[in-house]
Amino acid sequence: MGSDARLALPVLAALLLGTSEPPATLDQFEQVLAAQPSATAALGQWCAARRLAPDPQIRAAVISGRTTDPPGDLRRILDLSGDVRMGYRHVRLSCGGKVLSEAHNWYATERLTPEMNRTLDETDTPFGRVAAPLRFTRERLGGERGAASYCPRGTVLSHRALLRLPDGAPLAYVVECYTAQNLARPD
């Protein structure tokens, strides 16, 4: 177990064992995020620990109709030649009807299986769940309190990260915009 995971365990235990729920802090939330390679998995843990919904399943709602230009050097970051298709998803991740994050995800379609690409193109399944069999890791590139570029108003925490395959090849570049719903008291 990595050091980030060890740091997150006491936070999760305190949240699960507490009888009256204190308000969550951004520091606690960030510890849980840092302990997982997938924001989807971290949000699922957080939703369950905070009891934000009776069924702590994370669901993605694809936001269609909006095209967002990628950062200028993204093809270089993802190590993609000019003719390779880059996938893009803009989603809201929710737990029990509470929107926990809005995310922009640019990814190397050639590094996913055809079935994974089809699932991403045709369903609302979260990227982290679809790509989990690839055992990717997460390299945090930056974060800030509040809204970063690409994030909507009301964002309380923003992260930028690069997801890498076990061989080090870049899989995806993500911008994650976390909402105040993560800090809400349970229902």
Report residues per predicted region.
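Basic side chains
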Residues: 6, 89, 159-160
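Bacterial Sec-dependent signal peptides at the C-terminal "C-region" and cleavage site
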Residues: 2-21
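Low-complexity, intrinsically disordered Gly/Pro/Thr-rich segments
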Residues: 156-165
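N-terminal domain-onset segments
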Residues: 18-94, 98-150, 164-187
